[in-house]
Structure formats: C-alpha cells, structure tokens
Amino acid sequence: MEEKDVYTQDGTVDIHKNPANKEKTGNWKACRFILGNECCERLAYYGMGTNLVNYLESRLNQGNATAANNVTNWSGTCYITPLIGAFIADAYLGRYWTIATFVFIYVSGMTLLTLSASVPGLKPGNCNADTCHPNSSQTAVFFVALYMIALGTGGIKPCVSSFGADQFDENDENEKIKKSSFFNWFYFSINVGALIAATVLVWIQMNVGWGWGFGVPTVAMVIAVCFFFFGSRFYRLQRPGGSPLTRIFQVIVAAFRKISVKVPEDKSLLFETADDESNIKGSRKLVHTDNLKFFDKAAVESQSDSIKDGEVNPWRLCSVTQVEELKSIITLLPVWATGIVFATVYSQMSTMFVLQGNTMDQHMGKNFEIPSASLSLFDTVSVLFWTPVYDQFIIPLARKFTRNERGFTQLQRMGIGLVVSIFAMITAGVLEVVRLDYVKTHNAYDQKQIHMSIFWQIPQYLLIGCAEVFTFIGQLEFFYDQAPDAMRSLCSALSLTTVALGNYLSTVLVTVVMKITKKNGKPGWIPDNLNRGHLDYFFYLLATLSFLNFLVYLWISKRYKYKKAVGRAH
C-alpha cells in the first residue's frame, strides 16, 4: 500500500503530532465522540437559554421588553465571542486544544449559574407567587455567570463543527462525500440536545425549581467534556497556520506599497511557491481569481522586494495563495450579511414566541400545563424530521435534476431556508391577529391567559425548524468549504456572528419600535400586557425585512464564484 493511501493528504496529524493514519484516525469513528459532545453541550446551552426570558421575568423582576432584550443581548454575545476562540485556534492552539481550554470556563460558568439559582444569599429573595425582588449583588452574580458561559461557548462553538469536518480528508473523494453528510448529522445532534432541553429541562424549571433546572444542564456539560476527551486518540488535528489577521494585513500593506505597480496580464508571473505545497502551514494552494484585482499587486515581484537567504519579506511580497485568502474572506462577506435578518427571525423563538405563548391556554389535558418555552420542541422535531429527509431523500432526488453531488449548491440550499423563514413570520403574525381578535370579541384585555390553545403556535415553530435545516446547515457547510484551509475556525466564527448580529438587530428593532409606537400615551406594539399591543405588526415587519433580504441574497448569490484549491497542505 502506498504511503498516500495510508496517511491523509490534507496535512492533518494525530494527537501525538504524527501524520494521521487513515485507518486509525478520523472518519465516523472520531465523529461519534464529537457528535456526542455537541449533543450534550447544546442540551446544556439550550437547557439554560430556552426558558431564560421567563427566569428574568419571574426571578429578576424584569418586564417583557427588558427581559427579551437581555436574552437577545446575551445570545448575541454567545455568537460574538467565537471570534476570540477562532483566532486562538487558527493562529496558536489549533481546534482541539482551544476546545480543551475553553470547556473549563464553560463548566465554571454553568456551576456559578446553578449556585446563583439555588444557594441562599445568592438566589433572588423576597419572592411571592409570581415574582422575586433580587438585590443588586444577586443580579450581578447571575449575569457574571451568564457571560462566563458566553465566553466559554465562544471557544467551543467556532471550532467543533470545523473540527468534525477535519476528520474527513478532502483529497479522498469517498471521505469528501461523508463530510457533507457530517454537517447534517452534526445539526441533528444539536437538536437532539435542544429537544431534551425544551421538554424535560423546561418542565423541571417551571415545576421543580430553577436550582435543579440549571443543575441538570451543568451535569450535561460535564458529560460533554468527557465525550470530547474520550475520543482524543481517534482525532485528526489540523496544525495552526499562524495568525490569519497578520497574513491579511500583510497583503493589504504590500498592495498599498505597490499601489502604482501594474499587475501583469499573464497571472503566472505573480509570485507563488514553486512546489505543490503552500507556504502557509496547514493550507493548500488557492487558484488565482480575477476579482478584487487591486490585491494582486501584493503578489507582483519588484526590485524593491527584499529577499534574504531565499526568504521573502511578507510585508512587501505575498504569495498568490495568501492574496486569495483575503479575497475569499471579502467575497464571503455579502453572503454573510444576508444571514443577519434570518438570525433575527430565528431569535424570536426564545423571545416573542414565548411571550405570545404566555398569553394563551397552556393546558394539555385537565391536569398538565405545558410551559410556553417548551413549544420550541416543535422547532426541534421539525429539524429532526427534515435533517434525515434532506440527507436521505431530497439530495438523491435533487441530484437527478441538478447533477450536483450535493443535490443543491450550498447557496441554493440557504436561499430555500430564507424563503421558508418569510412564511414563518407571516404565520406568527396571522396567529396574533386571530388572538387579538379573540381578546377584542370577548373583552379579555386584562386576562393573563385567554381560552385559545397554545398549540396554535405549532405551525410557526415547524416552519422555523424547516428553515434552519436549509439555511443554518447550509451556512455551516458553506463557510467551512469556502474558507481558506488555515482560516476555517475564523470563517466558522464569522458565520456565527450572523446569529449575534441578528440578536442585536432584534434588540434594536424592539427598542426602536417601542420608542416610536409608545408616543401619545399609546401602549406600543410590545407592552407588558400583549393584549393591548400589536405584536402582529412586529411579526409583519420581520416578514417584510426577510423578503427584502431575500431579494438582496438572490442578487449576491448569482454573482458568487466558488473557490478552487489545488495541491496539498504541509
């Protein structure tokens, strides 16, 4: 057997820093531990976040708009901190050791959160049937724990999906096909954890207590850590390629230094290493593209370039691959930006959907009440249904028409999800119109809950789940696949920032809408008593923004050109 058949060709190594053996490492034998880790970690995250808006209202005595904004601000931070973890992973530690470091911050935050909800003196006091009146210290401890978790997840989230994809050699056609399937099952694992969180854990929080409700997710996070480390001997590790930000700035500086230099018509004259390997550790060479030609100046050799002992000064002369890294990041940005509005729609599940459900009849039978936050289980059920259906049925069917091995291109897949999200917001808006009509007809303005079943919310949750399978999984695969090899954690983090900015956009929209609609003594669209508001207008506003966003996405996606990599990594 030839050496190339024994070892991977993508530059990966095993835990002992030896070339990765195909038979002993990677593939599904490694991914089972990664999927187990992700399932338990997401159970912990959603077990804490799904019902957070109700904790803020009932235990920290916050109003609807304040609680919703605090949830979206925290959730947004959870998707901004991955930029920190991604930079550390790509530049210094690699994905494995970054995850291994940040899990301890995560567990510490979860532990403190549990203590803040269960230990006398730390948990909110002065409680009556509906709410508590915490002091400033108790509130501070809670938010410190919450943002420790945000930092911990920031080191894990951008790395774990890319780390799983690293277990498949892109230079092996069989493994390359399996990698595409991995992203579907990765998202499936996320939603298995989310399903347990939305049912069992929310019920515990609402019926047993918040101490147990946060304690169980903490135990789940400890189990996630065990899953991760148990698989260490099977993992393939990509070596860090040095600071990606440094390489980006080197191209920019070199290009501006040669601002008056003309780029040759023959692009083969641009500087590139002579052998098959890229000069960037852990990265394959990238084929030159004709877009963003200004940056090609950084790869034009001139007499002013200083070369010592065969080494090029990278602040004066950059390889074509290094230039194409920057181009790849820039061309990803328009696609990235269109994900922000979708994330805003998605964030409504943990805020406005829950608040809407709080006003409806939550009885399931005579003696059981389902917490409004538990309705998100139908989003999860939708994801768990559509993920294998997409992987096993839709892709093979689509291949017959598109002749694409993936069924749809990644951009087509994401676009389908954007369309579905528009209908999700329209559905939520129509339900709110019907609910408000019931309130008006029965003069139920001051009733805490009206006689209208919460299960009328199911369609909007199912549509959000369907949209996730197309857009979020498409984003995971797209940003990994189109990222330069040595910037994959960074690009995965970049895709996650759409969720952060989507949450922040939701906060801004709620704040602006309330400021405008509360004028002249009116209660506004989203008052504490939703029976006197117009939440339907807010949902229709999001539907309109989503439609406009989709039109922009169509224009961008038609002009996008997929990257091409050649050679092998060293």
UniProtKB/Swiss-Prot annotation:
The chain crosses the membrane at residues 99-119, 140-160, 182-202, 210-230, 329-349, 377-397, 414-434, 454-474, 494-514, 537-557. Its main location: membrane. The keyword ATP-binding does not apply. It is found in: Cell membrane. Keywords: Cell membrane, Membrane, Peptide transport, Phosphoprotein, Protein transport, Transmembrane, Transmembrane helix, Transport. One of its GO terms (molecular function) is dipeptide transmembrane transporter activity. It is a multi-pass membrane protein. The modification Phosphothreonine is found at T98. The keyword Nucleus does not apply. One of its GO terms (biological process) is protein transport. Pfam families: PTR2. It comes from the Eukaryota. SUPFAM superfamilies: MFS general substrate transporter. Disruption phenotype: Reduced growth and lower N content when cultivated on dipeptides. No effect on germination. InterPro entries: MFS_trans_sf (IPR036259), POT_fam (IPR000109), PTR2_symporter_CS (IPR018456). One of its GO terms (cellular component) is plasma membrane. Expressed in cotyledons, hypocotyls, leaves, roots, flowers, pistils and vascular tissue of sepals, anthers, carpels and funiculi. Not detected in seeds. Peptide transporter. Mediates the transport of di- and tripeptides. High affinity transporter with low selectivity. No transport of amino acids. PANTHER family: OLIGOPEPTIDE TRANSPORTER-RELATED (PTHR11654). Belongs to the major facilitator superfamily. Proton-dependent oligopeptide transporter (POT/PTR) (TC 2.A.17) family. This is Protein NRT1/ PTR FAMILY 8.1. The gene is NPF8.1.
